[in-house]
């Protein structure tokens, strides 16, 4: 299962992403309430359909604030230029069995690689765009 970051969703909603579409068709996508929240702050069209579709996806385990702080300390995530929401996504991927994190954010991708949680479906599927 792949936890999809906001950056990937934005590209998909604007232009479409073949790799994400294939993962959705295969039932391999995880959502997270913080990603849904970030997307809800954008100008989604059609708003209700997009938000409901995201909410209907399987959800990653949501880490507590203490769990996130432990992940930050254990993996020395400070000073990498990632934000607290990013740290929550890393912790969620760590806590969700078999999950990996797909992002197009360079700093978050580096942190995901550091934790061996990075997913790059576009690189393996050959159908999507990567940056």
Identify what each model region corresponds to.
Residues 1-34, 40-52, 58, 118, ...:
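Short, well-structured N-terminal submotif of metal-dependent ribonuclease cores
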């Amino acid at each position: 299962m792949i936890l999809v970051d906001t950056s990937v969703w934005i590209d998909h909603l604007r232009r479409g992403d073949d790799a994400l579409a294939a993962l959705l068709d295969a039932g391999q996508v995880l959502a997270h309430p913080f990603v849904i929240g970030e997307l809800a702050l954008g100008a989604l069209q059609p708003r209700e359909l997009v938000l409901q579709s995201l909410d209907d996806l399987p959800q990653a385990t949501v880490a507590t604030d203490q769990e996130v702080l432990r992940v930050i300390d254990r993996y020395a995530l400070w000073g990498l230029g990632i934000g607290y929401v990013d740290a929550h996504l890393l912790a969620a991927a760590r806590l969700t069995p078999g999950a990996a994190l797909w992002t197009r954010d360079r700093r978050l991708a580096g942190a995901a690689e550091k934790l061996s949680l990075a997913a790059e479906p576009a690189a393996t599927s050959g159908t999507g765009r990567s940056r």
